[in-house]
């Protein structure tokens, strides 16, 4: 009886945690490569390497350089937003997610991004 009750309690907690997003804590949304022909390509490539290693502050510098080089790059703004989120600047991250969303209408990775939708309070 105690074993069944214990299993039931664990199962309920797993469902609760999954529903609140806590089950995904610690996961990092992937940074995006530049669109073909983008002037930001070299900066984003370097930034992605640092981002994947958890060097979010260094990645941010590269992503910002990419966004400056190609202000119309949705991927650059998206990556800036990811790095800003990781470094704790959520207000600025939200601004860059909005820009990425507006510029990236044809990019399903951006349009369907969970973290972007959370920042923009979308469903």
Residue ranges and their predicted role:
Residues 45, 79, 113-114:
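Canonical tetratricopeptide repeat
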Residues 52-53, 86-87, 119-123:
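Register position in tetratricopeptide repeats
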Residues 64-68, 102:
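Conserved structural position within tetratricopeptide repeats
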């Amino acid at each position: 009886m105690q074993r069944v009750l214990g299993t039931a309690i664990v199962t309920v907690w797993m469902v609760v945690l999954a529903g609140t997003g806590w089950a995904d804590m610690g996961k990092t949304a992937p940074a995006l490569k530049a669109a073909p022909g983008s002037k930001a390509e070299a900066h984003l490539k370097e930034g992605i390497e640092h981002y994947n290693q958890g060097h979010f502050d260094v990645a941010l510098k590269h992503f910002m350089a990419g966004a400056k080089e190609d202000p119309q790059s949705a991927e650059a703004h998206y990556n800036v937003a990811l790095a800003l989120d990781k470094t704790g600047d959520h207000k600025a991250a939200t601004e860059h997610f909005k820009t990425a969303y507006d510029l990236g209408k044809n990019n399903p990775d951006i349009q369907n991004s969970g973290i972007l939708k959370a920042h923009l309070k979308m469903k």
